[in-house]
């Protein structure tokens, strides 16, 4: 049995084939279920080689990873069904039909349960960006998650405590967006092949007047989805690479096995690509960690032919009391220097979720970074196009992160004092008040 299941078997026991002795069905680390027929007896069990549980549609696969089945005759028909949990907390019913075909019990394909309205949730490791997507004057939530999806969560009511619509998935060519690692896209190996870890920002990237979505993922590729408009606002064009006018080959993290296409931007995985007009020239720039973990500014420009490109990233951000940051301990190097938000390699790289907002009300953009909740770096000086930040610590004492949170600024009170909305590992969204005395 050890060699038949792709890790984390989570076995459940029942007489699945109706022959009077208990059999096994195991979950796994990825997305499948494995059937082990008991060819022995109840008192002396002996199991045939495992086979992927399948039905007339093919192998039964769940939506995400880390599959945990339990036995329950959920519909009371006398046959043992499976109730199966995924990594992101969703639960599916896999109904036993009561039939056996070629020695295998026949189950229907998974049907995921839904529930009545409750606190807003979007999968696991949710990554919100607050933005008025539908143009009705209320900040909505555009979010990614560990499954590699992107959702529109509409603000229905406005006001200080909004009422929210259920998450609706963005689509390309009629199919929900689903960025996944596949067999070789994760730097932590093929066991992560169904994860995508989308993290994003929203801006009018092509200047057509509609907001677009700029995204990073498990791959570390910075891409963008063009907004096609339409009544529901969910239709996007296929992903396109963000273009950079490199002077040579496109750089990449040292541990990447694959080479970026010329003119594309590949950086550390799972880090926020902040699309904003940083220099106030009317073009949308990009701020993101570079391939070595330094916070970098990619300035937008227009070529003589009219094409919009990014210049190679420049390290214009400095830390006055924290030149190297760690999301668990905070300051990893207290000396002054260029701001490096992660010096980890391989699987310890990237993961930084960032945003900019005037947190203390002094008229300068401060930097917010993921931590056990979120921390902030105060903008203390701007000189010759460069910025110096002072590390100020966490904005709250509440612990929300096992891996990372994802902050985005909100102003639901409408008083121009920013608060934070944090996406957390549990997929829920948490509101953090601003305790800073505003300089305004």
Identify what each model region corresponds to:
Residues 1-6, 39-64, 97-123, 156-195, ...:
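Blade-edge motifs of beta-propeller repeat domains
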Residues 6-12, 28-29, 86-87:
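Solenoidal tandem-repeat scaffolds enriched in leucines and small polar residues
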Residues 9-16, 67-74, 126-133, 198-205, ...:
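Beta-propeller blade termini
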Residues 18-27, 76-85, 135-144, 207-216, ...:
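Acidic/hydrophobic-patterned starts of short beta strands in beta-sheet-rich repeat architectures
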Residues 31-32, 89-90, 148-149, 220-221, ...:
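Loop/turn residues immediately N-terminal
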Residues 35-37, 93-95, 152-154, 224-226, ...:
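Conserved blade-register residue in beta-propeller folds
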Residues 401-440:
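Blade-level signature of beta-propeller repeat domains, shared across WD40, Kelch, NHL, RCC1
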């Amino acid at each position: 049995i050890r060699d038949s299941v792709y890790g984390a078997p989570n076995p459940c026991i029942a007489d699945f084939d109706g022959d009077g002795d208990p059999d096994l069905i195991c979950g796994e680390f990825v997305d499948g279920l494995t059937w082990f027929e008991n060819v022995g007896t109840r008192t002396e069990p002996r199991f045939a080689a495992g086979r992927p549980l399948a039905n007339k549609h093919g192998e039964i696969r769940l939506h995400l990873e880390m599959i945990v089945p339990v036995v329950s005759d959920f519909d009371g028909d006398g046959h043992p069904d499976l109730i199966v949990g995924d990594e992101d907390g969703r639960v599916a019913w896999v109904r036993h039909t009561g039939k056996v075909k070629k020695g295998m019990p026949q189950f229907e394909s998974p049907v995921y349960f839904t529930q009545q309205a409750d606190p807003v949730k979007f999968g696991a490791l949710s990554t919100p960006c607050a933005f008025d997507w539908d143009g009705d004057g209320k900040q909505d939530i555009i979010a990614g998650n560990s499954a590699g999806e992107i959702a529109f969560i509409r603000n229905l009511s406005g006001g200080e405590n909004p009422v929210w619509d259920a998450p609706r998935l963005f689509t390309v060519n009629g199919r929900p967006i689903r960025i996944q690692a596949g067999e070789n896209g994760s730097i932590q190996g093929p066991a992560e092949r169904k994860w995508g870890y989308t993290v994003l920002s929203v801006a009018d990237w092509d200047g057509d007047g509609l907001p677009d979505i700029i995204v990073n993922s498990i791959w570390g590729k910075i891409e963008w989805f063009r907004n096609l408009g339409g009544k529901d606002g969910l239709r996007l064009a296929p992903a396109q690479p963000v273009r950079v006018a490199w002077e040579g080959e496109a750089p990449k993290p040292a541990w990447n096995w694959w080479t970026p296409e010329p003119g594309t931007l590949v950086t550390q995985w799972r880090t926020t690509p902040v699309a904003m007009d940083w220099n106030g020239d009317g073009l949308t720039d990009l701020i993101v960690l570079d391939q070595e973990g330094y916070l970098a500014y990619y300035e937008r420009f227009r070529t003589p032919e009219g094409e919009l490109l990014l210049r190679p990233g420049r390290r214009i951000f400095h830390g006055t009391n924290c030149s190297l940051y760690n999301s668990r301990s905070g300051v990893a190097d207290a000396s002054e220097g260029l701001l490096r938000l992660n010096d980890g390699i391989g699987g310890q790289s990237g993961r930084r979720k960032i945003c900019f907002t005037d947190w203390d009300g002094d008229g300068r953009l401060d930097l917010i970074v993921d931590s056990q909740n979120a921390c902030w770096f105060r903008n203390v000086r701007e000189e010759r196009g460069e910025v110096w930040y002072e590390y100020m610590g966490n904005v709250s004492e509440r612990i929300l992160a096992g891996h990372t949170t994802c902050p985005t600024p909100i102003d639901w009170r409408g008083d121009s004092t920013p608060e934070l909305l944090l996406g957390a590992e549990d997929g829920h969204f948490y509101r953090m008040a601003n305790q800073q005395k505003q300089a305004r």
